[in-house]
Amino acid sequence: MILTLTLNPSVDISYPLTALKLDDVNRVQEVSKTAGGKGLNVTRVLAQVGEPVLASGFIGGELGQFIAKKLDHADIKHAFYNIKGETRNCIAILHEGQQTEILEQGPEIDNQEAAGFIKHFEQLLEKVEAVAISGSLPKGLNQDYYAQIIERCQNKGVPVILDCSGATLQTVLENPYKPTVIKPNISELYQLLNQPLDESLESLKQAVSQPLFEGIEWIIVSLGAQGAFAKHNHTFYRVNIPTINVLNPVGSGDSTVAGITSAILNHENDHDLLKKANTLGMLNAQEAQTGYVNLNNYDELFNQIEVLEV
């Protein structure tokens, strides 16, 4: 069983418009509302590829119940921790080939709720074999909250796949308890090191070999349309991917995380892990719906991916 954590989920609302008129009335014909958050995208893709998955995180109020019901309708198991605050909305306005987003900050978690979730998590940890943590921390939690979760996973021997960025990731990296996998994009990688971006292989090798990343088994760096660069223990890989028609890239990173987590759970070899992860990321990009993959195209893309030891 895989446990996914989305500590700051949202109800994602999409408003497609022919044109966005500022300081005027905009009427929307079709509205899409989904259970959102990076971890829930990971959850949906894991469910689609047939992995046993359980979703958790904080939810509150009517919007929190909306998320729970959406997962129920999709036959996805969940064990959220209820809080006093209201789960947030995140609004995307699609207009003239552009996307304007309005993102609520979300509820503030108090000390009692923060401690209560840790106890809740410890109970869930007893019955899972991998944990995928995605996205930002809600207001009120200390920056080391993910590190506290990772410490408990490490004590139980449960691998952690972590997808976050900025100060939250920096805090985890400076902590003695390390995730099994991190998945920064190339910009995030060099920001962590306060270095100028450099896509050359030698620079990437030096970057992921810095002391900041010591103790992390897998570092998988997204290069966007150029594929990926990865380090597994002391081995480096370059992943070349085919050119595809991209319909909606949002959620592709989350689908990649789903592939990594699935491969970790099933003890797949390095090449298959990297190919599965990138295949699912590309499949998501070919769909309008976030966190959705058409598995009919899986084998074709999987076989076109090239993984080279460098």
Swiss-Prot record:
Protein family (similarity comment): Belongs to the carbohydrate kinase PfkB family. LacC subfamily.
Keywords in alphabetical order: ATP-binding, Kinase, Lactose metabolism, Nucleotide-binding, Transferase
GO molecular function, one term: ATP binding
Annotated InterPro entries: Carboh/pur_kinase_PfkB_CS, LacC, PfkB_dom, Ribokinase-like, Tagatose/fructose_Pkinase
Enzyme Commission code(s) on record: 2.7.1.144
Catalysed reactions listed for this entry: D-tagatofuranose 6-phosphate + ATP = D-tagatofuranose 1,6-bisphosphate + ADP + H(+)
Pfam families cross-referenced by the UniProt entry: PfkB
Coiled-coil regions listed: none
GO CC list: cytosol
Pathway: Carbohydrate metabolism; D-tagatose 6-phosphate degradation; D-glyceraldehyde 3-phosphate and glycerone phosphate from D-tagatose 6-phosphate: step 1/2
CDD domains: FruK_PfkB_like
Name of the protein in its database record: Tagatose-6-phosphate kinase
GO process annotations (BP): D-tagatose 6-phosphate catabolic process; lactose catabolic process via tagatose-6-phosphate
Listed Gene3D superfamilies: 3.40.1190.20
Gene source species: Staphylococcus aureus (strain JH9)
Domain of life: Bacteria
